[in-house]
């Protein structure tokens, strides 16, 4: 296996060396690196065309050139552009071309290898016997690059034997010509009022001239007789019948001898002329690429059709039911072929539209139900206090012990803020006009009771207060008056400023009622008093104790 790989590598190296040492009209058979991309053309076809002198060989392009340069300057610029290895090969080819003879290919390759290694190490004096003289090398290079021209596409200077376009007679080098090819297969351009092409109707348009945009681009080439001596290692069998071996090529044997060169712009050649080399000729695989692209497009279209049909067949259950119903009711579908893809797609879209409409209706019903539940929520909250009001009214109608209400009021009094308010209210009673009394108006009793309950800080919610106010309006005046008298005659009436003021103004209340004196206070409650004398009236603390005992006894 190792011997096989080594043998293949050796054959490839020999083929590469053979192509490198081949010289046609002072040019090479391989590109010189103007374009870094891999060659897309058929190399064998291009090399054969160059050997047949139907196409300009590959020359090393120069970045700059002037006709006024001396010979040494031209040689220096060319050798610098070629590099040491290609310069040695060129020198070897020029030396071998002096004899104008073609020897054995292997002997020439062996001689070229030895000459290349020798030329890289020797000095410029060239005093070694059998080596090419400096004068002849200079003459050969200056002859090849005499009257160099610039390529309008790559802007490099090449020898004057250019390719010329068949349509407009514009120069173009072989480096640029072999890169021009057809575009990739694509859909045709659609203009207005034209039907849309199918996905697999691909086309491959011929390459156009980069100068005049003429289709089916091609070039013509006429070799320069002055450069014929600078050819080396050419096989005479590869030359066409109308081209003589080098050294004997004459003007009469050229097929284009009757055409002035460079050609005139008015002279045009047909794309199928035998002297024209078209881009399709050096890129013969364009038909294969077009057919491959069409087959690939057909496969994609077929796969898409199968996928769509599969999705339609495996759609919703109601869609299948609708399809079956339509088929059963269709009088023209008895034993007939399956429906086309367009009809199935229309049914599928109709079913999707129905599903979307049903979903929209369902969403609207859900929104309406949620709105109704939101609106009914406050009415339920309002209706709850009604039952509470009824129960509260029943409690008010039933006679309750006086001490129960007193205990609730005493608990409210125990807070420091209530005691302070009680002291302030009692002081206002003592300093007020005791003789001024006023009969309590029965019509203002509900409002009065509501103010009393609010100021005594009863911990009731706002709905309960509103319910109590509504309830007071509905009870009998007798029960209201009775409850009010019980509150006014209670011993703790002086702790509430409103009850104390009502008690002071009432003419029916006994002035000797047991009212807690504001001058008395208890140290446990944290109340300081200016007068600590004993009084016959019980203090707030004593009354609270008695009330607690009564509550426990009850």
Swiss-Prot record:
Keywords: Cytoplasm, Phosphoprotein. One of its GO terms (cellular component) is Golgi apparatus. Residues 122-131, 528-538 have a biased composition (Polar residues). The keyword Cytoplasm applies. InterPro entries: Sip5/DA2, Znf_C2H2_type. The modification Phosphothreonine is found at residue 128. The modification Phosphoserine is found at residue 127. Residues 103-132, 314-343, 369-403, 523-554 are annotated as: Disordered. Residues 108-120, 543-554 have a biased composition (Basic and acidic residues). May negatively regulate the snf1 kinase. Belongs to the SIP5 family. This is Protein sip5. The lineage of its organism: Eukaryota, Fungi, Dikarya, Ascomycota, Taphrinomycotina. The gene is sip5.
């Amino acid at each position: 296996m190792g011997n096989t790989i080594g043998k293949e590598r050796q054959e490839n190296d020999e083929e590469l060396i053979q192509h490198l040492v081949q010289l046609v009209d002072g040019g090479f058979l391989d590109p010189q690196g103007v374009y870094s991309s891999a060659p897309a053309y058929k190399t064998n076809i291009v090399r054969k065309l160059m050997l047949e002198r139907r196409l300009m060989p590959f020359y090393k392009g120069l970045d700059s050139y002037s006709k006024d340069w001396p010979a040494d300057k031209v040689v220096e610029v060319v050798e610098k552009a070629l590099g040491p290895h290609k310069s040695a090969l060129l020198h070897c080819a020029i030396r071998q071309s002096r004899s104008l003879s073609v020897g054995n290919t292997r002997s020439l390759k062996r001689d070229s290898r030895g000459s290349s290694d020798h030329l890289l190490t020797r000095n410029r004096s060239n005093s070694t016997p059998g080596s090419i003289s400096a004068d002849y090398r200079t003459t050969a290079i200056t002859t090849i690059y005499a009257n160099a021209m610039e390529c309008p596409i790559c802007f490099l200077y090449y020898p004057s034997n250019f390719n010329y376009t068949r349509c407009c007679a514009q120069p173009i080098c072989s480096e640029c010509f072999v890169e021009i090819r057809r575009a990739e297969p694509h859909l045709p351009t659609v203009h207005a009022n034209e039907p849309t092409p199918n996905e697999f109707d691909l086309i491959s348009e011929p390459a156009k001239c980069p100068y005049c945009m003429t289709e089916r681009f091609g070039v013509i080439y006429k070799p320069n007789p002055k450069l014929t001596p600078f050819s080396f290692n050419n096989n005479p069998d590869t030359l066409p019948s109308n081209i003589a071996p080098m050294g004997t090529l004459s003007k009469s044997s050229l097929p284009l001898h009757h055409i002035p060169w460079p050609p005139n712009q008015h002279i045009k050649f047909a794309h199928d002329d035998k002297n024209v080399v078209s881009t399709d000729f050096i890129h013969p695989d364009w038909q294969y690429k077009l057919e491959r692209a069409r087959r690939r497009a057909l496969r994609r279209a077929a796969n898409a059709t199968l996928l769509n049909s599969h999705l339609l067949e495996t759609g919703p259950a109601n869609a299948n039911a609708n399809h079956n119903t339509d088929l059963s009711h269709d009088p023209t579908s008895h034993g007939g072929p399956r429906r086309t893809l367009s009809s199935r797609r229309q049914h599928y879209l109709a079913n999707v539209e129905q599903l979307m409409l049903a979903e929209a209706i369902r969403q609207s019903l859900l929104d309406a139900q949620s709105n109704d539940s939101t609106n009914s929520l406050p009415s339920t909250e309002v209706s709850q206090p009604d039952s509470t009001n009824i129960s509260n009214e029943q409690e008010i109608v039933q006679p309750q012990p006086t001490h129960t209400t007193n205990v609730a009021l005493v608990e409210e009094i125990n807070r420091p803020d209530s005691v302070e308010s009680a002291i302030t209210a009692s002081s206002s009673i003592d300093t007020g006009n005791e003789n001024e009394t006023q009969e309590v108006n029965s019509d203002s009793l509900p409002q009065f009771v509501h103010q009393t309950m609010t100021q005594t800080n009863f911990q009731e919610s706002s709905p309960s207060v509103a319910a109590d106010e509504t309830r007071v309006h509905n009870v009998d005046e007798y029960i209201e008056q009775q409850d009010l008298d019980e509150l006014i005659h209670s011993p703790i009436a002086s702790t509430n400023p409103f009850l104390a003021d009502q008690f002071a103004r009432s003419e029916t209340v006994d002035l000797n009622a047991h009212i807690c004196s504001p001058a008395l206070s208890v140290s446990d409650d944290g109340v300081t008093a200016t007068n600590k004398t004993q009084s016959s009236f019980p203090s707030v603390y004593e009354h609270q104790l008695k009330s607690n005992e009564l509550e426990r006894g009850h």
